[in-house]
Amino acid sequence: MLTLDYVQDPSHGWIAADRQMLAFLGLLEVTSTYSYQDQDLIWLEEDCDGPRFLSALSRVGIDYQLVDTHTRGDAWIRNLPRYQP
């Protein structure tokens, strides 16, 4: 089972995905401007990119679980660079 971090602040959330996993799933080209990157860890926004990633995992038979973390203010993820393939 794949364990994925899911960080949420009061107004948004992001799911962590390894760049190699995104490449394996054919998802390096994300559609939103609200996903971020921290070296090879990509933080996919929860409204569009995250669900596409989770659907792709299910499609290829990879089970996953999300580990939720909530912040009171803006999440530190907002300070990362925007994702670029």
Whereabouts are the PLM-identified features?
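Short, extreme N-terminal segment that most often corresponds to the first beta-strand
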Residues: M1-D18
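Intrinsically disordered, low-complexity boundary segments flanking structured domains
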Residues: M1-L4, L28-T31, L66-V67
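Short, flexible beta-strand-to-coil junctions
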Residues: P10, R19-Q20, E46-D49
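A short, structured beta-strand/loop element
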Residues: G13-D38, L54
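A short, exposed loop/beta-hairpin motif centered on an aromatic-Gly-Thr core
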Residues: Q37-E46
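Short, compact, well-ordered microdomains
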Residues: D47-P85
